[in-house]
Amino acid sequence: MNQLSLLAEFGEPITRVENALAALREGRGVLLLDDEDRENEGDIIYSVEHLTTAQMALMIRECSGIVCLCLTDEHANKLQLPPMVINNNSANQTAFTISIEAKHGVTTGVSAQDRVTTIKTAANRDAKASDLAHPGHVFPLRARAGGVMSRRGHTEGTVDLMQMAGLMPAGVLCELANEDGSMAKTPEIIAFGLKHNMPVLTIEDMVMYRNQYDLKLA
């Protein structure tokens, strides 16, 4: 079965987006799938605004362990976060910056609580570059201007979802993994969503939603 038929129990594309936005406003997580011919993987996504230590612990336990903070290009510039590498030749051009740690309020930086502290410090509207140390255990990602309409990636999807939900334009993501360490695909992602009461949606759903409502996002 393909991605679309497996997702049918979560409703039609527009409904899937609306359910995801409602969940984010309520402080719950969502699962975002990219295109089948791209990574074909699903990321757990939480808003920074409502992020809890328990949610971070679940991400660390159930996912790849590489917890990323998705930021607008403007906010990443404000924090003076240069690219992780000068020549980004990765397949999907994921815009990693140098890693970060909060300068205050953390110990080793690797615990769930410490990562939440770092994330909330960095995403704060009044945050300054001097609030952060490098390297660290949180990996910021720059979302491309135009969101999923310009790049069909989880980074852009995350920031778009936060803006569409009326939340701070910053979110965290991590790729869902199976118990054996392999990456979860659509059937496992759907099962996880049902178990943990997380709506599942796709990048394509978001593109359709933005086109239908002619949404112009930063």
UniProtKB/Swiss-Prot annotation:
Gene3D superfamilies: DHBP synthase. Pfam families: DHBP_synthase (PF00926). Pathway: Cofactor biosynthesis; riboflavin biosynthesis; 2-hydroxy-3-oxobutyl phosphate from D-ribulose 5-phosphate: step 1/1. Keywords: Lyase, Magnesium, Manganese, Metal-binding, Riboflavin biosynthesis. Its EC number is 4.1.99.12. The keyword Metal-binding applies. Binds 2 divalent metal cations per subunit. Magnesium or manganese. The record marks 137, 175 as: Essential for catalytic activity. GO terms for biological process: riboflavin biosynthetic process. InterPro entries: DHBP_synth_RibB-like_a/b_dom, DHBP_synthase_RibB. The keyword Cytoplasm does not apply. Belongs to the DHBP synthase family. This is 3,4-dihydroxy-2-butanone 4-phosphate synthase. It comes from Shewanella frigidimarina (strain NCIMB 400). The gene is ribB.
